[in-house]
Amino acid sequence: LSIELEKSGALFVGDNAQGKTSILEAVCVLMRLSSPRAKRMQPMVKFDSDQGFGIAGEAEERALRVSFSRGKSVMFIDGEELKTQSEYLQSSGLVVWMGNEDVELVKGSGGVRRHYLDFLCSQIDPAYRVALSRYRRVLKARNLLLKDGGNRDQEVNAYGELLIEYGDLLGSVRERVVSDLLPKAAEVQLSISGSGVNEELGMEYVSGCGGDMRTALETTYESERRQRQTLAGPHRDEVKLLINGMAASDYASEGQQRTMALALKLAQGEILRERGERYPIYLLDDVFGELDATRRNALMNHLPEDSQKLITTTNVDWLSDDLGARLEIEKWSRFTVNEGGVSGG
């Protein structure tokens, strides 16, 4: 599959389960070497396949190419193979992914919010991405030792030291980013809700180790041995989302929850632009069917004019003449997606 996209944006129109999301996901993987729908790339390679898959494209006036096979990834920029993912990511693009499942940011489990933070923090701090990968490996190894149940205290403690090293970095970056997100997301929330509406968004970072990883590991060790898993650390971090001081998951309406999710994603875009000193690409996966006209228009009005926007949708009934004119939609690429095939342009 090969397609050429206008710099301003592109529309991909088609019924559900025709392959629209896979196109946006491919763009995301090319830019960030990761998918917003999966924590790791290897599960995306078929179990019985030795070939894997590859993606290539142009971004930031550079030719990007990546390939993934079982246990291996290869990356090129302008034809030169790069040795590390960090090198590649310094020159590839930034991404904001928006989907109709984003409401889970508000009403879903803490894991959804941690994944949101990981995707954002990894784009603005190269050291974060490295620490996250190492933390996950060490956590898995330590949990295996705890499950073994034998006299492995020395080994468990050694892995604990590594958890402290990587976990402290993850926690400090997450806490700082949540602090930066709050005023931006709160401002967007008020803008979308409209004047006269009393909807104050709040965010609170809650450390999964109480702010002191070493003390937490020492305190919970006996419980860990009984439960055979690591009980403290960034893998237990939480971000509390509040509406007028109350838990948004319990007290916010469905509409308020969707507005909060939009605000969080749009605030993410602002932080990426400020920290990365360039506009991210916005990938909007079938978000308009779940939004009323007010939120739909507010979302499009908040997308930066100079950013590229790729949108999937089952129809364009939501695209009013006024909104189309504002977005200069006539300059966009437009494709029809059917059974994995793409036509138009």
Language-model segment annotations:
Residues D285-V287:
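Walker B catalytic acidic pair
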Residues C28-V112, C121-Y128, L182, A186-E187, ...:
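Nucleotide-state sensing region of NTPase/ATPase domains
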Residues L1-D15, V29, N151-I281, E290-T294, ...:
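Conserved NTPase motor "head" modules and their coupling/switch loops across ABC/AAA+ ATPases, GTPases
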Residues E87, S91-S92, G99-E165, G340, ...:
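A conserved P-loop NTPase coupling/switch region
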Residues N16, S34-A38, D48, C121-I124, ...:
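Flexible interhelical turns and helix-capping residues at alpha-helix boundaries
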Residues K20:
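Conserved lysine of the Walker
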